[in-house]
């Protein structure tokens, strides 16, 4: 049996530039891998993908990716996958996309790399726009739907705390609430990202997070509580995770326990 770790990400800012000809929205974002992981176990056996939280196999991005891998390569996959989910679904942390990228990269290696890095990137990107980032990791600017990546080194370090309410945010619902007034120019977003890369985290903005706070009162409650504690809150992706730079106080931990929020303290 092989064990691999599947990291989460946060978005250190996300801007929507408009619509692509495909109908998808064009975004600009700064991805940051964080040391918060799902644990994935791979063993030889009948192709099966299971999780500890009961995600139906046919809905799991990993299963979809493995079936597509079989179709493209003509190779039958004889591996059973078990995913210990620590990263909540619908949290804006890219857990499912990370699982997809990590498993397909490992299975490709185990089978002698029938797919090139570019082919693997195209495969996972066809299933999830966030997935190609997890083949790269660390920090990267995401353009297009998020799949056109530019690796960068940021000046951001130190403690970061995630606060995750008990609500799963629907990315589709958030995107469908976008209006033209939410769009910004590429020049505006590029300038913001360069400032954030240099360590000016107060420049972080996320229009999807603003919409998620309107759609899901639970996210806004966390956001307002973090503000009350004196920190500047940020939303990752389309929610539901709210994060801030700093450690978790006893007051936050107590409030989180009462409200069922998950608190994760990390070091960047």
UniProtKB/Swiss-Prot annotation:
Pathway: Isoprenoid biosynthesis; isopentenyl diphosphate biosynthesis via DXP pathway; isopentenyl diphosphate from 1-deoxy-D-xylulose 5-phosphate: step 3/6. Keywords: ATP-binding, Isoprene biosynthesis, Kinase, Nucleotide-binding, Transferase. Its EC number is 2.7.1.148. The keyword Transcription does not apply. The active site is at residues 9, 130. One of its GO terms (molecular function) is ATP binding. One of its GO terms (biological process) is isopentenyl diphosphate biosynthetic process, methylerythritol 4-phosphate pathway. SUPFAM superfamilies: GHMP Kinase, C-terminal domain, Ribosomal protein S5 domain 2-like. It catalyses: 4-CDP-2-C-methyl-D-erythritol + ATP = 4-CDP-2-C-methyl-D-erythritol 2-phosphate + ADP + H(+). ATP binds at residues 88-98. Belongs to the GHMP kinase family. IspE subfamily. Catalyzes the phosphorylation of the position 2 hydroxy group of 4-diphosphocytidyl-2C-methyl-D-erythritol. HAMAP family: IspE. This is 4-diphosphocytidyl-2-C-methyl-D-erythritol kinase.
């Amino acid at each position: 049996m092989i064990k691999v770790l599947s990291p989460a990400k946060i978005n250190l800012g996300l801007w929507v530039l408009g619509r692509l000809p495909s109908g998808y929205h064009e975004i600009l974002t700064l991805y940051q891998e964080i040391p918060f992981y799902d644990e994935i176990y791979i063993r030889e056996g009948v192709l099966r993908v299971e999780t500890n939280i009961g995600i139906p196999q046919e809905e799991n991005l990993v299963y979809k990716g493995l079936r597509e891998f079989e179709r493209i390569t003509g190779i039958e996959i004889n591996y059973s996958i078990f995913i210990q989910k620590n990263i909540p679904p619908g949290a804006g942390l890219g857990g499912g996309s990370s699982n997809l990228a990590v498993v397909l990269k490992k299975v490709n290696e185990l089978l002698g790399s029938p797919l090139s890095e570019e082919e693997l990137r195209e495969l996972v990107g066809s299933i999830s726009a966030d997935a190609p980032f997890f083949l790269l990791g660390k920090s990267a600017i995401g353009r297009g739907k998020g799949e056109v990546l530019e690796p960068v080194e940021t000046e951001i370090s130190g403690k970061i705390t995630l606060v995750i309410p008990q609500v799963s945010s629907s990315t589709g619902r958030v995107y469908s609430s976008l209006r033209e007034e939410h769009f910004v120019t590429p020049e505006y977003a590029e300038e913001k990202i360069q400032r954030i890369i240099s360590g000016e985290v107060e420049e972080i903005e996320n229009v999807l997070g603003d919409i998620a706070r309107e759609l899901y009162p639970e996210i806004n409650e966390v956001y307002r509580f973090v503000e009350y504690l004196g920190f500047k809150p940020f939303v990752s992706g389309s929610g539901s995770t709210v994060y801030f730079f700093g450690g978790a106080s006893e007051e936050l931990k107590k409030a989180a326990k009462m409200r069922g929020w998950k608190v994760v303290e990390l070091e960047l």
